Amino acid sequence: MSAQVIAIDAMGGDFGPRSIVQASIACLSATPSLHLTLVGQPSLLEDLISGLPAADRARLQVVAASEVVGMDERPSQALRGKPDSSMRIALELVRDGKAQACVSAGNTGALMALSRFVLKTLPGIDRPAMVAAIPTQTGYCQLLDLGANVDCSAENLYQFAVMGSVAAQALGVHRPRVALLNIGTEDIKGNQQVKLAATLLQSARGLNYVGFVEGDGLYRGEADVVVCDGFVGNILLKSSEGLATMIGARIEKLFKGGAFARVAGAVAMPLLKRLQADLAPARHNGASFLGLQGIVIKSHGSAGVQGFQSAIQRALIEIQENLPQRLHGRLEDLLP
């Protein structure tokens, strides 16, 4: 297998580079064909990788960046005021062909603005969208947009549906079912943009559009791709993650309540731990910026080692599936 090269914004996120570097080292150990470029403060990064075995160190490069984009900075400041930020340098490595993907846990708005400026969008795409896998009763669905576009036109939603369908196919879903997230399944439900998007999707050739889906239908697995604006999608994503964490904590507390509960917990806990691990946000961390002329994966700023590993793994899959090129090849057929 040919080498995959991923540029890592090592200075982004809430906790600094330590967990990012640990996740990067773990991915190197698990994937012999992987090469990583850590972008950030060289002295700090070199210290964190100083004990790495020579074989792994040979697949790890450090590229200097003198600036860091803060988590609370405006995108305009990152775009105009920090030309040597670790985030920007990582994206420029992708643009220049020195890396095949960029992974960052940094400021979402800044990452989107820089990605659009440095990498540009694919022909026919007005706005990139954030997409991630959401666990359902039957497997997973791809949910987009997750916050990059708070206000969306019907045409934006249509483009998101096209991109989501192609992404789901790249991840192994045959003829993915595409749905619009709505407050009901009847044709009369929804705001004007959702209704107009439905009209566009109903007439689209090559898309398996199945209509509207409600929030509970998403979790029942009624669609493989669920489309909404970024305002709704971000709230849904954060609510899902909070619910999964709360359920796990409540279950653990329940089985510590008394002697009988502890005995029952000892029997049930292995299965419950498996369920908790399957639903854990860290396992599904990593949202893809679809619609760019390059692969960009956004990790949660609060992600730990396992979460950042998941983001790198998503980047690997998209590299292996050549996702931007696949998108480009399908857009001419599916966009009006």
UniProtKB/Swiss-Prot annotation:
Pathway this chain belongs to: Lipid metabolism; phospholipid metabolism
Keyword terms: Cytoplasm, Lipid biosynthesis, Lipid metabolism, Phospholipid biosynthesis, Phospholipid metabolism, Transferase
UniProt subcellular location: Cytoplasm
Reactions that this protein is recorded to catalyse: a fatty acyl-[ACP] + phosphate = an acyl phosphate + holo-[ACP]
EC number annotated for this UniProt entry: 2.3.1.274
GO molecular function, one term: phosphate:acyl-[acyl carrier protein] acyltransferase activity
Pfam families: FA_synthesis (PF02504)
GO CC, alphabetical: cytoplasm
Example GO BP: fatty acid biosynthetic process
NCBIfam families in the cross-refs: plsX
Family label: Belongs to the PlsX family.
Subunit structure: Homodimer. Probably interacts with PlsY.
Job description of the protein: Catalyzes the reversible formation of acyl-phosphate (acyl-PO(4)) from acyl-[acyl-carrier-protein] (acyl-ACP). This enzyme utilizes acyl-ACP as fatty acyl donor, but not acyl-CoA.
The protein, known as: Phosphate acyltransferase
Classification lineage: Bacteria, Pseudomonadati, Pseudomonadota, Gammaproteobacteria, Pseudomonadales
